[in-house]
Curated annotation (Swiss-Prot):
<keyword id="KW-0963">Cytoplasm</keyword>
<dbReference type="InterPro" id="IPR050181">
    <property type="entry name" value="Cold_shock_domain"/>
</dbReference>
<keyword id="KW-0804">Transcription</keyword>
<keyword id="KW-0010">Activator</keyword>
<comment type="subunit">
    <text>Homodimer.</text>
</comment>
<dbReference type="InterPro" id="IPR011129">
    <property type="entry name" value="CSD"/>
</dbReference>
<dbReference type="InterPro" id="IPR012156">
    <property type="entry name" value="Cold_shock_CspA"/>
</dbReference>
<protein>
    <recommendedName>
        <fullName>Cold shock-like protein CspD</fullName>
    </recommendedName>
</protein>
<dbReference type="InterPro" id="IPR012340">
    <property type="entry name" value="NA-bd_OB-fold"/>
</dbReference>
<dbReference type="GO" id="GO:0003676">
    <property type="term" value="F:nucleic acid binding"/>
</dbReference>
<keyword id="KW-0238">DNA-binding</keyword>
<feature type="domain" description="CSD">
    <location>
        <begin position="4"/>
        <end position="63"/>
    </location>
</feature>
<dbReference type="InterPro" id="IPR002059">
    <property type="entry name" value="CSP_DNA-bd"/>
</dbReference>
<dbReference type="GO" id="GO:0010468">
    <property type="term" value="P:regulation of gene expression"/>
</dbReference>
<dbReference type="Pfam" id="PF00313">
    <property type="entry name" value="CSD"/>
</dbReference>
<dbReference type="GO" id="GO:0003677">
    <property type="term" value="F:DNA binding"/>
</dbReference>
<dbReference type="InterPro" id="IPR019844">
    <property type="entry name" value="CSD_CS"/>
</dbReference>
Amino acid sequence: MQTGKVKWFNSEKGFGFIEVEGGDDVFVHFSAIQGDGFKTLEEGQEVSFEIVEGNRGPQAANVTKN
């Protein structure tokens, strides 16, 4: 599992990016966020996640809020 902070997340479009210290930003789609109800992330929020290879490069999977 990796950890990082949400750089930005657009709730209307359902995606954003997570900052990884010492690494590249990682794309995150709302479908990767674990939990019930409306799936969104807040800027600056700390999260844990796995990195998987998506259609357009690395993206976050199994995202949990810390």
